[in-house]
């Protein structure tokens, strides 16, 4: 047996250290019904609330300018547990990866299946895209109560993202000509979105928050997706101010031969290159 060289020992120790660090930086949560959206998968707002919790715990919130969320597979109740890494550096961003463990058909052992990824962009400034419009004079909104707050007594990202997802999907649906055609299996889904928290809205008397919807990219012939922009405003006893902005990709889907697929305005499946 050959004697171990110092370089080999260092490499082995480094590899073991990386493995231990990765294991310590992983967390898991049981998937329960309160975490699910109307489609039966883990909701966008749950991912964002989890992100906020660990950023706040590590005192990293002040350095966050915006983040991108990409959903890769729906995580469902049958998956039982969702696993995720704590925010860690990757290139110029912080990243959180989420996965579940599933047994593939015909296999005996479970395998790791990525379900979501959040890229957190760091910077000292948070700003909106383009010129800020005049605040809309909406007669509706959410009166902020304790249940809408995070641990810092500010309107939570969970509250904002939950409403943003509903408003973006429904607004894009109403803007789609396809909705006028009979299709009981039509469903609008969100594969990715960006979120920019502009300012924190702390609890105060008579505080309301409300969303403003606009189409950033309208439905086009032969395409399966559109883009919505949702701006969240807060108002108390003075002029409204924007507190968050999100750009949301919305995909039109339908059941085709028993499989949910992106479809164009005629209900036909479109290749990825044409989507």
Role assignments for model-derived ranges:
Residues 2-68, 72-73, 111-192, 244, ...:
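Hot-dog-fold acyl-thioester-processing enzymes
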Residues 227, 241-244:
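Glycine-rich phosphate/pyrophosphate-binding loop shared by adenosine-nucleotide-utilizing enzymes
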Residues 105-114, 238-242:
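Residue-level signal for glycine
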């Amino acid at each position: 047996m050959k004697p171990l060289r110092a370089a080999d020992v260092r490499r082995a120790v480094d590899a073991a250290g990386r493995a231990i660090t990765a294991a310590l930086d992983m967390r898991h949560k049981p998937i329960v019904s309160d975490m699910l959206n109307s489609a039966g998968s883990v909701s966008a707002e749950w991912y964002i609330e989890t992100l906020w919790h660990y950023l706040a715990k590590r005192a990293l919130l002040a350095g966050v300018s915006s983040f991108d969320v990409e959903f890769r597979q729906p995580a469902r109740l049958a998956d039982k547990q969702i696993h995720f890494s704590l925010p860690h550096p990757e290139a110029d961003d912080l990243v959180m990866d989420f996965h579940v463990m599933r047994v593939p058909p015909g296999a005996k052992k479970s395998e790791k299946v990525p379900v979501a990824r959040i890229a957190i962009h760091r910077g000292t400034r948070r700003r909106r895209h383009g010129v800020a419009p005049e605040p809309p004079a909406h007669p509706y909104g959410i009166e902020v109560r304790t249940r809408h707050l995070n641990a810092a007594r500010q309107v939570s990202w969970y509250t904002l993202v939950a409403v943003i997802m509903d408003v973006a999907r429904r607004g894009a649906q109403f803007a789609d000509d396809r909705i006028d055609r009979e299709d009981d299996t039509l469903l609008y889904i969100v594969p990715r979105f960006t979120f920019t928290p502009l300012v924190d809205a702390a609890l105060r008397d008579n505080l309301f928050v409300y969303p403003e919807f606009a189409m950033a990219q309208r439905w086009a012939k032969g395409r399966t997706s559109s883009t919505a922009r949702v701006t969240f405003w807060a108002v108390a006893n003075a002029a409204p101010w924007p507190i968050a902005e999100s750009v949301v990709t919305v995909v039109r889907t339908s059941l085709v031969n028993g499989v949910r697929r992106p479809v164009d305005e005629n209900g036909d499946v479109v290749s990825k290159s044409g989507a």
